Amino acid sequence: DFNALAYNGADEKTKKLFVNFTKRMREEEGVKFVTVLHDYPAADHEGVISVGTAAELVYWTAGASAGAEVNESLTNTAYDGEYEVDAKLKKSDYIKGIRKGQLLFYEEDGTLRVLRDINSFTSFAAAKNSDFSSNRVVRVLDSIANDVANIFSKYYLGKQSNNANGRNLLKAEILAYHEELMKLEAIEGFTADDITVEKGTEKQDVVVYEAIQPVDAMEKLYMKVEVA
């Protein structure tokens, strides 16, 4: 198992191959990981992080992403690698970069930090909104997909009858797992009504439906000041 894949080269064809591989593995094989590339916002996918600063920061970003906890954001995380990178940009450049889906670094008091922990997804729509551009949100969703699959494989696959009692046991275990995620503040507002475990088309099939509210980190502060 692995959590992140990285390539810091400049070859556009190779980048596209990485993106296509990532999409196929995530969407068709159910293997949840992220790929980190340098300056490739064209990926436009929640599973691909495009580092818009220096290429030298790609592998650090991949390592930090792979090691991040389910309730952790890399926003404002200090870079502790060995490279010296010039990350001084105009405010307008940072704004443009974020809109393009670039993960950028900024410098504060001599320390390099992650501006916002985002991925390259920018094609927001009603069915898939801007929440999916947050790496913390994607981290939560990927963790749930991986962990529920592991629970099923370890305790239920070929071991439990696919009847009402067996499905209720699976539901109870998944619910307990989500309660732990709420304690970690990875998700919020989850109740037993937000999950259903049903029999699928075939006798051996089980289908799980969930409604999830991932928690994200504070990133923007808006203030209203009243002058009396």
Model regions: which residues?
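Extracellular Cys-Trp
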Residues: 1-76
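Structured, hydrophobic secondary-structure cores that serve as assembly/anchoring elements
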Residues: 65-228
